Amino acid sequence: MSGKFVLEKGSSGKYHFNLLAGNGQVIATSQHYDSRESALHGIESVKTNAPGAKTDDRSDK
């Protein structure tokens, strides 16, 4: 099973999404968005930018 994005509307009325791994575990959570459309745009942005993203490991600093 592949991963998926789950879009939710919180009690505050704002939207956010989680990226779930194939096993259902949350591996990323977005910021909160004022509109559903903005949250969907955020999902598309992750889909577009993540495949070529490099890792900037700053854990030793």
Model-derived segments and spans:
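Short arginine-rich
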Residues: 45-56
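A structural feature that tracks compact, well-ordered secondary-structure segments
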Residues: 3-10, 14-34, 38-46
